[in-house]
């Protein structure tokens, strides 16, 4: 997982044992983003802060997540392809996923689930779509309260 921000970098220790290391909330958040890969079935996730600084890449927003141990949400993207190498199915799949995510945020569970299913026609076996389809099914029977902000809370790393 990739995130952007200030870190502390240096040597820690004393005597005969020093360890070169990085510290800071950015490092912890990047680690949490990395852990999100196993839940979403993805390989490379990055924060919106990274996307804002990159060019020439096709990415898709996978939504807002409140990562374990964090109080504020972070928007996460999947890096899909270099723009020049992206095929029509990848582009169309990303567009349909964006529509599905918008419906999800509006609490339109049936519409969102239908669009996530449609996304899988462009991106067969798309695990982020499956992840959200399960949440849509759960929210249809047990909807979140009125304070829900469209963010997925992750209880595990």
Give the ranges of each region predicted by the language model.
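A generic signature of intrinsically disordered, low-complexity regions enriched in glycine/proline
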Residues: 20, 29-32, 41, 130, ...
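Short clusters of hydrophobic/aromatic residues that line enzyme substrate/ligand-binding pockets
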Residues: 18, 67, 148
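Intrinsically disordered, low-complexity, charge-biased linker/tail regions
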Residues: 145-157
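Catalytic-core segments of nucleotide cyclases and related cyclic-nucleotide turnover enzymes
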Residues: 8-34
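Cytosolic regulatory/linker segments at or just downstream of nucleotide-handling modules
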Residues: 7-9, 36-111, 117-119, 123-145
């Amino acid at each position: 997982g990739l995130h952007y921000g200030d870190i502390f970098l240096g040597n820690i220790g004393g005597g005969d044992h020093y360890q070169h290391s990085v510290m800071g909330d950015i490092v912890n958040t990047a680690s949490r983003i990395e852990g999100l890969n196993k839940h979403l079935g993805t390989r490379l996730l990055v924060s919106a802060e990274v996307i804002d600084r990159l060019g020439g890449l096709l990415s898709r927003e996978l939504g807002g997540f409140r990562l374990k141990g964090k109080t504020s949400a972070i928007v996460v993207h999947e890096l899909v392809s270099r723009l020049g190498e992206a095929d029509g199915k990848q582009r169309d799949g990303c567009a349909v996923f964006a529509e599905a995510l918008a419906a999800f945020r509006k609490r339109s569970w049936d519409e969102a689930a239908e669009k996530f299913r449609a996304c899988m026609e462009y991106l067969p076996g798309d695990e982020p779509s499956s992840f959200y389809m399960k949440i849509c099914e759960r929210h249809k029977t047990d909807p979140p309260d009125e304070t829900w902000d469209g963010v997925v809370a992750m209880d595990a790393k």
